[in-house]
A protein has these predicted regions:
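N-terminal glycine-rich phosphate/pyrophosphate-binding loop and immediately adjacent elements
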Residues: 2-123, 127, 132-136, 140-143, ...
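Reverse-transcriptase-like RNA-dependent polymerase core
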Residues: 110, 395-410
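Mid-to-C-terminal "cap/lid" subdomains and adjacent gly/pro-rich loops that border
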Residues: 42, 48-59, 63-74, 79-85, ...
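Short beta-strand segments that buttress and anchor functional surface loops
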Residues: 261-265, 391-392
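Conserved redox-cofactor binding core of oxidoreductases
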Residues: 61-77, 83, 87-89, 110-113, ...
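A glycine-rich dinucleotide-binding beta-alpha-beta segment and adjacent secondary-structure elements
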Residues: 78, 192-215, 222, 249-257, ...
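Core beta-strand elements of the Rossmann-like FAD/NAD(P) dinucleotide-binding domain
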Residues: 5-8, 267-277, 281
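Short, well-ordered alpha-helices that flank and scaffold nucleotide-derived cofactor binding pockets
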Residues: 24, 28, 233, 237, ...
């Protein structure tokens, strides 16, 4: 039997970064509105996070991996709301989390902004479409979001228009970051400490980062910002009805208009929630899945899927670095090659990001020779003696890259979902250019050996 609830003004599907920010801000600006925010997952108790366990490195590759497919494949996913994503025909793998806070629970907390040029790519570069507003129109909202998350950073980055001063100092560079910065300086290239949504000082009842490392399996001391610590408490204070463990199966369409949602709640009951306005914020895969499953048939729906194609170069150094200490993605970055240069043979540019080193078990797991005396030699040579430079490129919208439904029904009662993504020659050229620059920087920083990974399945 189906339960039909009283109507609300706005229902938000998804309590991740987008959905929770929207719900919290709307409730603040329009306190008389009746707002509900649902998520298929639940709340997580920080006492249960892997950082409290001695086997956290193993959990990071299995039940607490960033990919739902790896978590499900472990047979003991830490995220009970996971659903599989068929990525057989995709160059990249899904990284996402379902729960109150969404993927902000296991993100790396790097908090970059777009550049002014990103809003005018059609006018400037003849690709994609221009945005209907500019960077400077959006800038006040960037500032609001930075304030809500508590972004740590350093003002004055010459790659961007002037930003407001951060209320917290940036993450420390450490030995690894200092060595990388020296390499950029020798080449005369831009670099800057990352903006990170991580407390570098204790604030708002949350501790400062202690540089323990397992950020992507949830922050045990709450230093890393996630929306279960920021926007969702604000939303609750402002009267938003937060509903965990609600699997939304369908947008209800009546006479060509969306009138509500149909979902299964945590007790297994079928529920209809009528709403005047429906906001779907279930990430790029989950949103398309729900809309397609609801019978929407726009020819553009699910198509033109875009990632940031990624690759990286690792450099090995004679001196010991402090790579395993601190958030893996929050050392420093370079936008020396961010903008279009017609001489490169591709449009737009690349983002270079110096990342910290993986922990010991992860390092050992990816050795070319995984056992024996040679493995021990390689591990002694590489662990605490390496850094990586991640290359992120800008892909172009292509209709064949898409999210689609499968013929299989999953355990949540919805059709399965698959991702189809072929990397274009344009993306490959931009990644290769970035890999060349990353290797050049590592050599300038003193690396005696480098190793290219031409495609990182992020």
């Amino acid at each position: 039997m189906e339960t039909r609830l009283d109507p609300v003004d706005v229902v938000v599907v998804g309590a991740g970064i987008g959905g929770s920010a929207f719900a919290a801000r709307l409730a603040e600006q329009a306190p008389k509105l009746r707002i509900a925010c649902l998520d298929r997952g639940g709340w997580f108790d920080r006492r249960d996070l892997p950082a409290h366990r001695r086997d956290w490195q193993s959990l990071a590759m299995t039940s607490w991996a960033t990919s739902p497919n790896l978590r499900l494949g472990s047979g003991a996913s830490a995220c009970s709301a996971d659903y599989p994503v068929d990525d057989t025909h995709s160059a990249f793998k899904p990284l996402m989390w379902n729960g109150m806070g969404g993927s902000s629970l296991n993100w790396a907390a790097h908090f970059p902004r777009l550049h002014p040029s990103d809003f005018v790519v059609r006018s400037q570069d003849g690709i994609g479409d221009d945005w209907p507003f500019s960077y400077f129109d959006l800038e006040p909202y960037y500032d609001l979001n930075d304030e809500a998350f508590g972004v740590a950073g350093l003002a004055g980055d010459p790659a961007y228009p002037a930003k407001k001063s951060r209320r917290m100092k940036p993450m420390p560079l450490g030995r690894l970051g200092s060595v990388a910065a020296a390499g950029f300086d020798r080449l005369g290239w831009h670099w800057w400490p990352v903006d990170a949504a991580i407390n570098t000082v204790a604030e708002d009842g949350r501790a400062a980062c202690n540089h323990c490392g397992p950020c992507q399996q949830g922050c045990a001391n709450g230093a890393k910002s996630s929306t279960d610590l920021t926007y969702l408490p604000q939303a609750a204070r402002n009267g938003v009805d937060l509903r965990p463990h609600c699997v939304v199966r369908e947008i209800v369409i009546e006479a060509g208009r969306a009138t509500g949602i149909r979902y299964v709640d945590g007790a297994g009951r079928d529920v209809v929630q009528p709403a005047a306005t429906i906001v779907v914020a279930g990430n790029g895969i989950g949103t398309a899945r729900l809309l397609l499953a609801s019978g929407l048939d726009s020819p553009a729906l699910g198509r033109n899927l875009m990632f940031h194609p990624a690759a990286y170069v690792r450099g090995m150094f004679r001196q010991e670095l402090d790579g395993p200490l601190g958030p893996i993605g929050c050392a420093l970055y370079s936008h020396q090659f961010y903008e279009t240069d017609p001489g490169r043979g591709f449009k737009r540019g690349v983002h270079l990001q110096v990342t910290r080193e993986n922990p010991l078990l992860s390092q050992a797991a990816r050795l070319e020779q995984p056992w024996g005396a040679e493995a021990q030699r390689l591990l002694r040579e590489e662990f605490r003696h390496s850094m990586a430079v991640l290359v992120l490129a800008e892909d172009l919208p292509e209709a064949h890259n898409r999210v689609a439904l499968t013929d299989r029904q999953e355990s949540d009662g919805m059709p399965g979902v698959r991702v189809e993504y072929r990397m274009s020659e344009h993306s490959r050229r931009s990644l290769d250019f970035g890999l060349d620059r990353a290797e050049e920087m590592l050599r300038a920083a003193g690396a005696y050996r480098t190793l290219r990974v031409p495609l990182a399945p992020l």
